[in-house]
């Protein structure tokens, strides 16, 4: 049997959050207050925004795409992979026979860059379930174009791949 500790989270009332310590001092946070899931929390999939000639990787595109194939292989071996790319047919040729295609979904969408952490949906959990927030990335203070990347989440939700 684990221990329960009340813990206010982000100004939440003590009753809104419980921390359970297990036998080996592992812990699990149970909360009804809005929060971002931990990086180790269960997830429905991972998004990769695929490199192409219009991204910063042009000078070493072949090498970077090979790296993305290796990343895609590892992800799709374990869970759903969403690949965002303006060229899904080309990406399919690159990964066919090298990646578990049963776990791969594609979203055809123009992109500026590959950094999904900058433009991907933000998941918010609360008592009502899961919400996806459509974060607007400003390209590091307008240093880089991000207009196409800022459309990815909306298009993924509209096409029901997310």
Where do the language-model regions lie?
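Intrinsic, low-complexity polybasic segments
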Residues: 7-10
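Aromatic (phenylalanine/tyrosine) cluster motif
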Residues: 3-4, 21
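The feature marks the mature, well-folded catalytic cores of soluble enzymes
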Residues: 21-162
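Universal eukaryotic N-terminal targeting presequences
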Residues: 1-2, 25
């Amino acid at each position: 049997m684990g221990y329960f500790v009340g813990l206010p989270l982000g100004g939440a009332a003590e009753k809104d959050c419980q921390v359970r310590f297990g036998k080996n001092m592992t812990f699990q946070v149970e909360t009804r207050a809005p929060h971002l899931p931990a990086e180790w929390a269960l997830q429905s999939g991972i998004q990769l925004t695929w490199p192409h000639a219009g991204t910063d990787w042009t000078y070493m595109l072949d090498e970077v795409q090979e790296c993305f194939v290796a990343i895609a292989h590892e992800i799709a071996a374990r869970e759903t992979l969403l690949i965002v790319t303006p060229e899904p047919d080309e990406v399919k040729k690159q990964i066919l026979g090298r990646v578990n295609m049963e776990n791969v979904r594609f979203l055809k969408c123009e992109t500026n860059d590959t950094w999904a952490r900058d433009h991907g949906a933000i998941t918010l959990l609360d008592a009502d379930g899961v919400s996806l927030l459509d974060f607007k990335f400003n390209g590091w203070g307008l240093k880089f174009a991000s207009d196409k990347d800022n459309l990815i989440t909306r298009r993924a939700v509209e096409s029901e791949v997310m």
